[in-house]
Amino acid sequence: MEYKTLNNGVKMPVVGFGVFQVKDEEECKRVVLDAIDAGYRLIDTAASYTNEDAVGAGVKRAIEEGVCTRKDLFITSKMWVQDMKNYETAKRAIDASIEKSGLGYLDLYLLHQAMGDYFSAWRAMEDAYKEGKLKAIGVSNFYPNILTNFCEVVKVKPVVNQVELHPYYTQEKALETMKYYDVIPEAWAPLGGGRYNPFEDEMLKGIAAKYNKSVGQVLLRWNVQRGVVVPKSTHVERIKEIEKNIAVSTVSYTHLTLPTI
């Protein structure tokens, strides 16, 4: 497994498992356990996914079964907009996420959107970070101009900005801004987010055939080679492909391929 070192020194796996749209509690527990058992160490959830408790239960089960330790894992959650009203609502949201997970702390906590009083919400996150409740703090869906203004003002700079990133939406300006402020890009919808059909894309199929990989692996590796962390959401019926996705972090495609995508 490859890791990225964040601007505060914390190491983050480059390929992760996202639980967006895994609503059923028992199903979520099971797929999280299966993902960890298969080798995933980054688990990505959010308050708005309403499954922080199930993620925590799956994690604790994996620890109980000796698959991993808590320190082996990197658990991410996010604060939703309704909790960004002010400092106090944000502080309660942070504590609620930690309590629901039952894990004692979170490795990464993000502002899910640049909405509401997100500066006050960030101050609450800074304080929780200093208290050790959050090992790293970041943002999500911050456009380049918003991220620039944000980084110039806050005391603790975000370590990550999770944004939509895939070959159909490359976000070059966003990546340039993140690099300037030493913010690691993290992709949501690395496979196109349902608006595109990369698995029927002849160019991508050709690249996959060339390297004897799946189209999904090519897309994930494309992001990884651009310095992007990928917490891919995996449908339950494709859980058996996890091992192949983990292998993405160790497979290198020639740079001649990348400009083609």
Where are the language model's segments positioned?
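Glycine/proline-rich, positively charged
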Residues: 23, 82-159, 163-166, 170, ...
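Glycine-rich, positively charged active-site loop/lid region within alpha/beta enzyme cores that binds
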Residues: 15, 171-242
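Generic structural signal for well-ordered alpha-helices
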Residues: 32, 52, 56-59, 91-95, ...
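Hydrophobic faces of well-ordered beta-strands that scaffold small-molecule active sites
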Residues: 13-15, 75-77, 109-111, 139, ...
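Conserved small/polar residues in nucleotide/adenosyl-binding loops
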Residues: 254-260
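N-terminal binding-site loop/beta-alpha segment at the start of enzyme catalytic domains
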Residues: 1-73, 191
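Conserved, mostly hydrophobic/aromatic
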Residues: 17, 43, 55, 75, ...
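Active-site-proximal loop/turn and secondary-structure-junction residues that shape catalytic pockets
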Residues: 21, 47-49, 79-81, 115, ...
